[in-house]
Amino acid sequence: DLLGNGDLEAIAKREGKFPWLVDAAGEWTVRNDVYFQEARVAENGKGSPLSATSNGKSIGPELGFGHVLGNFHDEQVLLIKTAMGNRALGFDFRPPSSGRTDPDNKFEALEYKLMIDGVRKTLANIDKIVPGYNGAGYDVAGFVWFQGHKDSFSEDLIQGYEKNLVNLINDVRKEFEVPQMPCVVATVGFGGNNMSEKFVRILDAQMAVGNAVKHPEYAGTVASVDTRKFWREVDQSPRNQDYHYNRNAETYMLIGDAMGRSMVELLGGKADPLSVPVMSARATKQPVENSEDEKIAQQKSL
């Protein structure tokens, strides 16, 4: 959130954390080398250069993640986010390789289909989304997964989480024909070190896929990020909503940063230290200015 205790205004502008988010005039910085598109929300118009307001009034881990990846890559980066709350991996996002438990239920596996369709639609319109693209070509360079709350309410889904996550990774790789696509899984972190047992079981499944002993087939291509240390309590946060990490901006920034560092390592690099961000030259270039009509349409899509 951008307002309240633990919000981005407080931690960045008043407390001075994540100083690269704020420019010398006290305004939110804009990364013109990293573009953001919410595939489930945005229409076919232009994407948004990454900033604190790319996703409207709230931020997700994409902000921290995008800064790390933008620092690493010399090329333009496009972040495609497809998110829908209160959804389970074992039901809503159920991957094809997991089969169907209820073929007559139109909602089972629907979110998986919408996710894949959303990414494909975004890539099909990339020339409209990324200014100056001009047919440059692109690589589907990685996949990030951050989810787990809904599955914890079903014993069957808890038990099946690891297998469903393995199938998800494999199926996404098949969809985009990238057999060794780097994948980063961020665990649930609800409650931090005081996490309830049901969430611990989900976390264990999420950590397992990044463990080369348990899944040697993923060695060097899949990493897991334990997010428990990024949890902030209610008195440090804008709201009492554990399922949204109490809407604490620092939590989301740290999770995104950690996911970004893990992705960079999978790509064979090393991320800049958190305290010393270095923006590429491309980041400081002026973006292509949208018309007033385009700006209005873009705001309506957020």
Please name every model-derived segment.
Residues 1-302:
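Cell-envelope and extracellular/periplasmic
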